Amino acid sequence: METFEERYALMHAAVQKHMPGADMALIDRAVEYADVKHQRQKRKDGSPYIIHPLAVAEIVAELGLDMDSILGALLHDCI
C-alpha cells in the first residue's frame, strides 16, 4: 500500500520537473489543508484518501498545467 510520504514525493518531483520555481510553500499549504479535510477518510484498499488528490496533482503537473490547476487537483474533494 502506498504511503502519504511516497505519493507526496512523486507529486513534488513532478511539480519541480514540469514547473521549476513553483511556489512549493503554497502547494504545501494546499496539501496540509486537504490532508486535514480527508484525515479520517480511507480508500477502498485501506490507504489514506489523501493519496488520491496527490496522484491527481501529479498528473496535472505532468500535463504541464498551471499552478491553479495543481491547487485545484489537491483541493478538488475538500468541499
Where are these regions (language model features)?
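Active-site helical microenvironments for divalent-metal-assisted chemistry
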Residues: M1-I79
